[in-house]
Amino acid sequence: MFRIYGIGSVDSYSKMTLEIKKGQNINLMEFLRELVELQYKRNNIDFRRGMFRVTGDRVDVFPAQLEDIAWRISFFGDEVEDIKEFDPLTGEFIQSFEEVKIFANSHYITPKPRLENAIKEIKKDLKIRLEEFDKEKKLLEFQRLKERTNFDLEMIQATGTCSGIENYSRYLSGRQPGEPPPTLYEFIPENSLLIIDESHVSVPQINGMYKGDRSRKKTLSDYGFRLPSALDNRPLTFEEWNMMRPPTIFLSATPGLSLIHI
């Protein structure tokens, strides 16, 4: 399986982590605040990945990078007293740790300086687009885009995210218009091997994914549902994918000429 749809920047994601050590001095409320900044949500009832729950001086965290393991971090005053790994389904303790690293719950999480710059760029492009709609007498599109984008900006400023945050990924990753989006390829080692099964079916779909996505996003942009920059939240083109992919094995019982000549 290959991933050609854009995700957040590997540089931003790798920087947004929280390291907790046994014996570390940290206030409980400060720790919870940092979890929220990493897009974790508090839920004492439905405990799933990307969630945390609090009971007295004890915090259970279900790390985004793990599938079936959670961590229990116990505090004594302003000090981390204990860190234990447990099964969130049964509550059974597995082992203790001296330190753990908690990764962000979203690939679109962005350091504050870059986030502030992204907000400025979004406002700048919004102003340009609204002027275009005003000049073309498209009042409905004008109002729709203004309300939607300003609401998103308020949410981003308050919480660091919003519904559909991926549509602003170009600003968050600091890319120029038309640049390829960050993808899973940026997260894998350089010595990786890509294996594509049924490649005579899979590979031709790559261009189709890009064209279909662009057509849909252009409609959203034309009618004021999104800024034109949403078109840069896209899958890779075939040319970009072909240049970016690691060494690849194409598995096919009926390869066509186009596949043979890749």
For the regions a language model picked out, list residue spans one by one:
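ASCE RecA-like P-loop NTPase motor cores
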Residues: 1-260
